[in-house]
A protein has these predicted regions:
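Extended, loop-rich substrate-binding clefts of extracytoplasmic carbohydrate-active enzymes
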Residues: 4, 8, 77-131
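Asparagine-centered strand-capping/turn motif at beta-strand->loop junctions
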Residues: 26, 139-145
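Beta-strand-rich recognition/accessory modules
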Residues: 1-19, 29, 39, 106-111, ...
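Active-site/ligand-binding surface loops and adjacent short beta/alpha elements
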Residues: 148-150, 154-228
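Acidic-aromatic substrate-binding/catalytic surfaces of carbohydrate-active enzymes
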Residues: 22-78, 252
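Hydrophobic residues positioned within well-ordered beta-strands of beta-sheet architectures
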Residues: 14, 24, 101-103, 124-126, ...
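Beta-strand elements of well-folded, non-transmembrane domains
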Residues: 107-109, 128-132, 143-145, 157-161, ...
Length: 278
């Protein structure tokens, strides 16, 4: 297992390699997983060619860390401050063929405007582990203060699917979802296909399969309460300045989430886990 400091664009980053040759790169900015290559050298995550990589704006691609609120479901910064704060490398290592890095963030790491807007004592720990053809993320939120605070959380993973029109998601049949127009429906078909914009919040934690022309990703979660599935489609993609017009055809976002603000008691902690297997 090897760990080296490197750069991704202008961002300081940690690159770690498993004994089988699998490799991942995590920026300190946002604890943002920017690259995951399995032992065969194939990149599994999508990062936009147009995204800023200099540490002042959120990154389009990889795995953005959403905390303490999802989207605008809270009073603060959209999708929270975790993805635009600089984390610290706390630990790294591995055994039995695995490799991991662990990053941390607390209130002392925040920019003054973020600390003022969200005046709570907290500690975040995010550990990425590679083992074989699998990547696991373990995300822990601790309330280190004397009063409860509400929070939402998600890991907004962008998968490189190559060809959107050859991509499906299975495992969501009979599950309830809310779409971008706030319509609530039940998915009555076995596989979700992508031929238009999708922005769905599924009230489900079932195991999913993301099927592409060349790969099947097996996705599971613990501790979270929903799956979010998103692709902007052609029209919305054209309005995103940090995404090339045709890049929407290369990715699908599937994220484990707890989108609503839920209280965490003083001294308590919450842990969510997400596993991606190939």
């Amino acid at each position: 297992m090897a760990v080296t400091m490197t750069q991704f664009g202008a961002l300081p980053a940690v690159q770690f390699t498993a004994p089988d040759g699998a490799q991942a790169t995590v920026a300190l900015f946002g604890a943002h997983l920017l690259s995951w290559k399995t032992a065969d050298g194939v990149e599994r995550l999508f990062v936009s060619s147009q995204t800023p990589l200099y540490g002042s704006k959120a990154i389009r691609g990889g795995v953005p860390v959403i905390f303490p609120q999802f989207n605008v479901r809270g009073p603060g910064l959209r999708h929270g401050f975790a993805r635009v704060s600089t984390w610290r490398l706390a630990d790294s290592g591995g055994d039995n063929g695995s490799a991991f890095v662990e990053l941390v963030l607390d209130q002392s790491d925040l920019a003054p405007e973020h600390a003022q807007a969200w005046p709570h004592q907290f500690a975040l720990t995010l550990r990425f582990t590679m083992h074989g053809n699998a990547l696991e993320a373990g995300f822990t939120v601790r309330n280190t203060g004397a009063a409860p605070f509400p929070f939402g959380v998600a890991l907004h993973t962008y998968y490189d699917v190559g060809q959107l029109n050859a991509t499906t998601i299975s495992g969501l049949q009979h599950q309830q979802y809310t779409d971008h127009e706030l319509n609530t429906r039940i998915q009555d078909y076995p596989a979700l296909h992508f031929n238009e914009k999708h922005d769905r919040l599924y009230q489900s934690t079932s195991t999913l399969m993301l099927n592409t022309a060349s790969t099947t990703f097996n996705l599971s979660q613990q501790g979270f309460t929903e799956w979010v599935v998103w692709n902007p489609g052609q029209v919305d993609a054209a309005a995103l300045v940090d995404l090339a017009d045709d890049e929407y055809q290369r990715f699908v976002c599937i994220e484990p989430a707890r989108v609503d603000q839920q209280p965490l008691a003083a001294g308590a902690q919450w842990t969510g886990r997400h596993r991606i297997g190939i």
